């Protein structure tokens, strides 16, 4: 359904069958958007994306997940052969699926790692990051931290002292916690790390800690510049608060029916179907394949 009450959204509806810019890039959030709650791409959504790719649309998988947690889905969609990109760590890294080349990579200031770990300890919540093998965390039995393993299909690796363990560049850290505490802890983190790192929610139980200025919209802007395209050529679908920036930025921003309200408010279109019922397929058929 169209999100009414915004002149830009009304204009898009009027232009839909006429002079709307050709969509050449499709950015898709994964969890709660492209995948269902079992973290799978449904057959219908896969078929619709295949049709879009065959029409020359470049698919970008844009997620807070680490690159290793996105690559299996990229290969499932054939992006390693047909072309496409991975935007991982909420935009901290952009990878060309065919070549493996990193087009963009931004890492956290190493000095912030022990402070972030201390902040999490003071809040009595789990904090994690990644290495080449999986998810790295002191609280390896934590219910909320293990949701990242379920999401990414990566193993949990226990370390005794995360701050000392991380002696390599990282693109982000992730705070995992009871949803009832998310907003309070996030507000405290924003205050403590203001001007040095960005903290924002990406799910009911995750708070991202990323380099200052890293967000999906900024990284997509860099990718579009690399491709010689404009945001009018870009469509994006998402559901979480970390998707709001890209939904507001792109030419056609789509929120899933299951999206958080601020994301719906930023979108030009809200799907009638949620992520468990092919919401992405609905949006792609409507705006790219133009099926009513």
Regions found by a protein language model. Name each.
Residues 43-144:
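Active-site phosphate-binding/coordination module
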Residues 77, 82, 90, 193-195, ...:
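Short, structured coil segments at secondary-structure junctions
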Residues 24-37:
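Asp-based phosphoryl-transfer active-site loop
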Residues 2-19:
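Short, Lys/Arg-enriched N-terminal segments with co-localized hydrophobic residues
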Residues 56-60, 81-84, 172, 232-233, ...:
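Short active-site oxyanion
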Residues 52, 120, 190, 263-264:
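A generic structural signal for well-ordered alpha-helical segments
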Residues 21-25, 42, 208-292:
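Mg2+-dependent phosphoryl-transfer enzymes with acidic/Ser/Thr/Gly-rich catalytic loops
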Residues 119, 123-237, 241-245:
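Conserved acidic, metal-coordinating active-site core of Asp-based
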């Amino acid at each position: 359904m169209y999100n009414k009450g915004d002149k830009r959204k009304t204009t898009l509806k009027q232009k839909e069958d006429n002079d709307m810019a050709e969509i050449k890039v499709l950015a898709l959030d994964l969890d709660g958007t492209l995948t269902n709650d079992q973290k799978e791409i449904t057959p219908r959504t896969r078929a619709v994306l295949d049709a879009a790719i065959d029409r020359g649309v470049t698919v970008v998988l844009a997620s807070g997940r680490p690159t290793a947690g996105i690559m299996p889905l990229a290969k499932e969609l054939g992006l390693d052969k047909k072309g496409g990109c991975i935007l991982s760590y909420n935009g901290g890294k952009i990878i060309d699926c065919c070549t493996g080349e990193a087009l963009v990579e931004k890492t956290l200031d190493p000095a912030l790692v022990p402070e972030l770990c201390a902040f999490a300890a003071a809040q009595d919540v789990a904090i994690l990051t990644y290495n080449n093998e999986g998810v790295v965390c002191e609280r390896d039995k934590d219910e909320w931290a293990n949701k990242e393993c379920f999401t990414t299909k990566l193993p949990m690796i226990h370390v005794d002292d995360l701050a000392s363990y991380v002696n390599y560049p990282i693109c982000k850290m992730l705070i995992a916690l009871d949803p009832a505490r998310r907003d309070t802890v996030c507000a405290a983190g924003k205050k403590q790390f203001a001007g040095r790192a960005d903290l924002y929610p990406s799910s009911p139980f995750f708070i991202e800690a990323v380099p200052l200025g890293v967000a999906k919209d900024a990284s997509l802007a860099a990718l579009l510049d690399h491709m010689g395209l404009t945001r009018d050529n870009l469509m994006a679908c998402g559901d979480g608060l970390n998707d709001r920036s890209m939904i507001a930025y792109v030419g056609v921003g789509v929120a899933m029916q299951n999206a958080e309200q601020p994301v719906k408010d930023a979108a030009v279109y809200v799907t009638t179907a949620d992520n468990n019922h092919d919401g992405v397929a609905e949006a792609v058929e409507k705006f790219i394949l133009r099926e009513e």
